[in-house]
Amino acid sequence: PKKSYIEDNVFIGPCACFTNDRYPVRVKYKLRGPIIRKGASIGANTTFLSNIEVGEGAIVAAGAVVTRNVPPWSLAIGAPAKIKALPPKLRVPNRI
């Protein structure tokens, strides 16, 4: 959507849904899409509320519903997504 930013070496799985309006057609609200930092991986069928930042190297698991920022090099999993430590073996840059 408008006002979204995706940096380099990002993987976005199929059917990921990004929003840019937290209150659709209800109030005047500044549109703010997600910011996806370099090297992040977004799983299939994920949903992001507006104005969310996914940090560098973070992974969002398939089917997650992201309602808050995901710190760099962490794992977001579940609905709503909970933030977990990224396993050490996954703390490597994407090879896209």
Where are the regions that the model predicts?
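Structural signal for interior beta-strand "rungs" in well-ordered beta-sheet cores
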Residues: 1-77, 82-83
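A glycine/serine/threonine-rich, flexible loop-to-helix segment
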Residues: 87-95
